């Protein structure tokens, strides 16, 4: 059945069929400019549990002005391996060829993430399929596990990509965010892993998706699911910004000057809270159509403390710091420190400075979870695909289209004003 999303209204795309049965989780969103097409991905599960994931599903949306007309739900059976469940959709669009790569993991049977971490025995495979017609048809699955991870797999208790979107950098590099539970050592007498900790990293390709590699782990902080966005300061240097989930009640942020091979300035952002155990969040960069006054409070007491830095890249980052950015960041995430509720949209007008996030504009009041953003820069539009409900966050995955002006009108340029109440920004 076709549905239409109008600007500024939430439109459910995937609905839970029963509170103990078929459930859709883990949204990923991609926009393809030449065809004005949204691709909305999700996991179909037999229950809400991770180990009961089945396969990925897709709905294609055609944008007509500020309307999106959605086609029917399509199961992506191409994105499967025999005896495995498919999880964590992570799409990226390659502009030169027009090819869409859909990354995901395939996990053996019903083996849980916890079982893999405790035993140190990985049950996940790194895979992708691709489409050359904006998601109408898809290739056969390709397993990249040996090519990308190879002998290092013995140190990866388990791993995953995304979830959410990947990006293509100005250099042409394709970047897929990922994380692994890394095993630094083993108790040989018991054949059990020792001090296993999760760290984010990037998987990338410099030849339009023909071959793939992985970058260095983001250390020393524990980081899990992440997304990245490329920002450009006035000095003209592109910098890759990473936003990662942590269990530390605050979001982790890091910067890369080598296109994602390594990250520096890993820090906790006190302005971006995490609920207990954390939650996935989404980030996109964009060039603003209009520029109000910029954030002034870069010396806030909430400015993050630098945990790690690289001398070789410090000079470039220092050159960019303190200058207005050509790129802004938009970030989506639950806004409560206590539970996954009230999905917020945050704006950062100076991404290379500390503590310059706005107060959130509440896009959905009530239970919420994972989300994914897409920026339509030339049109001044944004899309958000997010988990939400009235009693539980897994009741549906909804889509919202909103404008650049709408963001500014709700946030009113606020960055750090302590007297502002997030309830002022709630949207019906």
UniProtKB/Swiss-Prot annotation:
The keyword Lipid metabolism applies. Changing residue 370 to F/C: Loss of enzyme activity. It holds the Pfam family BNR_2. Changing residue 88 to D: Markedly decreases enzyme activity. PANTHER family: SIALIDASE, SIALIDASE-3. Interacts with CAV1; this interaction enhances NEU3 sialidase activity within caveola. Interacts with EGFR; this interaction mediates desialylation of EGFR and enhances downstream signaling. This is Sialidase-3. It comes from Homo sapiens. The gene is NEU3.
């Amino acid at each position: 059945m076709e549905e239409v999303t109008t600007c500024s209204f939430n439109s459910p795309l995937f609905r839970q069929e029963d509170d103990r049965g078929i459930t859709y989780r883990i949204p990923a969103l991609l926009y393809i400019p030449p065809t004005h097409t949204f691709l909305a991905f999700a996991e179909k599960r037999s229950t809400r549990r991770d180990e009961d994931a089945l396969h990925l599903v897709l709905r294609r949306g055609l944008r007509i002005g500020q309307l999106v007309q959605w086609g029917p739900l399509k199961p992506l059976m191409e994105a499967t391996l025999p005896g495995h469940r498919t999880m964590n959709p992570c799409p990226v669009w390659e502009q030169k060829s027009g090819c869409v790569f859909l990354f995901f993991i395939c996990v053996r049977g019903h083996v849980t993430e916890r079982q893999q971490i405790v035993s140190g025995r990985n049950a996940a495979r790194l895979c992708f399929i691709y489409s050359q017609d904006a998601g109408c048809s898809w290739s056969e699955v390709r397993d990249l596990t040996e090519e990308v991870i190879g002998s290092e797999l013995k140190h990866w208790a388990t791993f995953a990509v995304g979830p959410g979107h990947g990006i293509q950098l100005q250099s042409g590099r394709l970047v897929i965010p990922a994380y692994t539970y890394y095993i630094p050592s083993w108790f040989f007498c018991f054949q059990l892993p020792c001090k296993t900790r999760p760290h984010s990293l990037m998987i990338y390709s410099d030849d339009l998706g023909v071959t793939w590699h992985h970058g260095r782990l983001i250390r020393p902080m524990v980081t899990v699911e992440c997304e990245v966005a490329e920002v450009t300061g006035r000095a003209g240097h592109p910098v890759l910004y990473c936003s990662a989930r942590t269990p530390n009640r605050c979001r982790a942020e890091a910067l890369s000057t080598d296109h994602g091979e390594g990250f520096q300035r890993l820090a906790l952002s006190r302005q971006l809270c995490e609920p207990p155990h954390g939650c996935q969040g989404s980030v996109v960069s964009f060039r603003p159509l209009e520029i109000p006054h910029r954030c002034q409070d870069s010396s806030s007491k909430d400015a993050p403390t630098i945990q790690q830095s690289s001398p070789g890249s410090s000079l470039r980052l220092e050159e960019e710091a303190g200058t207005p950015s050509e790129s802004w960041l938009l970030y989506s995430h639950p806004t409560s420190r206590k539970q996954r509720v009230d999905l917020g949209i945050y704006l950062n007008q100076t991404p290379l400075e500390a503590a310059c996030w706005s107060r959130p504009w509440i896009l959905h009041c009530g239970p919420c979870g994972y989300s994914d953003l897409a920026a339509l820069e030339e049109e001044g539009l944004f899309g958000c695909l997010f988990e939400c409900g009235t009693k539980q966050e897994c009741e549906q995955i909804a889509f919202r289209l909103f404008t650049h002006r709408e963001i500014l009108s709700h946030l009113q340029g606020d960055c750090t004003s302590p007297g502002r109440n997030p309830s002022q920004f709630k949207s019906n």
